[in-house]
Amino acid sequence: MLLIGVAGTELSAQERDWLQHDAVAGVVLFKRNFASRTQVAELSAAIRAAAPRPVLVCVDQEGGRVQRFREGFSALAPLQSFGAQYAHDPESALAAARAHAQLMASEVRASGVDLSFAPVVDLGRGNRAIGDRAFSDDPQIVATFTRAYVQALHGAGMAATLKHFPGHGTVLEDTHVDHASDPRPLEVLQAEDLVPFVAGIEAGADAVMMAHVVYPQVAPEPAGYSQRWIEQILRGQMGFCGVVFSDDIGMAASFSAGGVAGRVHAHLDAGCDVVLVCHPELVAESLQAVQGRSLNTAALIGLIGRGALGWDGLLAGTDASFTTPPSAHFGTTA
C-alpha cells in the first residue's frame, strides 16, 4: 500500500484518480496542504469522498518545528521540553506530555485527520533531523514518556505511531539529505535505542515508522529495506503485530535501492505494510510499480480515527491545569 502526498489545498482531477487506485492507503498532509482549519477539514472530506474504500488521512503534528497545521491550532511544544521538565518534576512533566498528546490528537481528529505520526521515540543524542523532537537522551526516560504518550493518544481516539525504528537519534546525519550509518552492534541498540520501542509496543502502539539508517553490524541495507529488522527483530523478537510504515521514499537516504520502483519494492519486500510517497511527482511511478502485487489492506482499518469529534468539544476531556505547563506552552493558538 502507498500513502501519497498531494500538491495543494484542494484535490486535482489527477489526485482524485490516484485515490481510486486499490494500492492507495490514503494521503499524508503537509504545510503546503494547509490554509485553515475549515479548509483542511474540507480537504480531508474530499479525500475520503474520492476513494472507493476507507482511507487514512495523516500528518506530522508533533509540535515545535514539526507542526504542519498552525493557524487556528494550538502551538505545541517540542517533546524535548517535557524531558527537561522531568529532571526536576517527573509527575508534572508526564502529566504535561499526556495533555500535549490529548490536545494534539483532539485538534487533529476534529479536523477530519485520522492520525499524526507520533510520538518520536528516538533518543536525543545530537541528530540533526531529530534535535528537540526527542524527549530525552536517556532510554528509560524516553520509554516512560512513550508509555504515557501512547496511552493519551488512545484516550483521544488516535492510533499511536512509534518512530523512527530502530532509532535515528544517535547518528549525526539527516537522512532527508544524506546517507546515515550507525556502527553499533545489536546488543548496544537493544540496551539503548530499542528500549522506548519496547515500551511503546507494550503500551499498545498501533504502528511503527522505519528509519532510513543503515546499521551494518545488523544488516547491510537501511532498516526500512531490511527483513532482518522488520520481520526478524521488530515482529519476531519484539512481538509487534501492527502496521509498519516506511519513511518517505523521496529522502536522500532511501536512494540506495535505486529508482522509485526499486525503493517501493525494497520496502514492501522487507515487510513494510505502507510506503510513504510524499512527493506528488513520484506517485504515478509508484502506483505503476505496485501493479500486480499482493497488498495488506486489512491492517490499516485499525488506524482510522475512532469516534467523531467536533472542534467545539475537543477539549472536553482535557484538564485545564495542563494546558500551559511551565516548560511547555502549548495551550495558545498559533
Curated annotation (Swiss-Prot):
InterPro entries tied to this protein: Beta_hexosaminidase_bac (IPR022956), Glyco_hydro_3_AS (IPR019800), Glyco_hydro_3_N (IPR001764), Glyco_hydro_3_N_sf (IPR036962), Glycoside_hydrolase_SF (IPR017853), NagZ_Beta-hexosaminidase (IPR050226)
UniProt superkingdom: Bacteria
Entry-linked PROSITE patterns: GLYCOSYL_HYDROL_F3
Keyword Cell wall biogenesis/degradation attributed: yes
Principal localisation: cytoplasm
Any one Gene Ontology BP term: peptidoglycan turnover
Keyword annotations: Cell cycle, Cell division, Cell shape, Cell wall biogenesis/degradation, Cytoplasm, Glycosidase, Hydrolase, Peptidoglycan synthesis
Function according to Swiss-Prot or TrEMBL: Plays a role in peptidoglycan recycling by cleaving the terminal beta-1,4-linked N-acetylglucosamine (GlcNAc) from peptide-linked peptidoglycan fragments, giving rise to free GlcNAc, anhydro-N-acetylmuramic acid and anhydro-N-acetylmuramic acid-linked peptides.
Family to which this protein belongs: Belongs to the glycosyl hydrolase 3 family. NagZ subfamily.
HAMAP family the UniProt entry points to: NagZ (MF_00364)
The protein's name: Beta-hexosaminidase
Origin species: Xanthomonas euvesicatoria pv. vesicatoria (strain 85-10) (Xanthomonas campestris pv. vesicatoria)
